[in-house]
Amino acid sequence: MTNWINTVSRDHVEAGVRGRFTQANHGKPHMLRKMARGDWIVFYSPKTVYPDGEPLQAFTAIGQVADDEPYRAEMTPDFQPWRRKVDFLDCTQTPIRPLIDQLDFIEDKARWGYKFRFGVFKIDDHDLEVIRSAMTDS
């Protein structure tokens, strides 16, 4: 299994949790195709609302990929984003700042936000456990 972080505004994460899905990179399929059933995905939200919401800088959801392939959804006739089904855990929104020193994927602690510019990226099991334990009771 692989562990992922998906950088998404909180309003979009909330829509995904309600609908049990994720999108990535504005609906493009490339990174979703790299995911497999059972992979963990953590959602980091730099803002409350896309594109001009208030700064949030928190992990806002966590779950596991629950299908085998991306699928298309019709939002409007001109926008049919690719998605993956996700089984979300019950969790608590968790600010990132108290966790920065424990997270190995953040190599430069002074410029901790840089990695999130990639949108979707892999993390190791240690980092997943740091985040998951902060967000859940387990």
UniProtKB/Swiss-Prot annotation:
It comes from the Bacteria. Pfam families: EVE. InterPro entries: EVE_domain, PUA-like_sf, UPF0310. Gene3D superfamilies: ph1033 like domains. Belongs to the UPF0310 family. NCBIfam families: PRK02268.1-1, PRK02268.1-2. This is UPF0310 protein MAV_1800. It comes from Mycobacterium avium (strain 104).
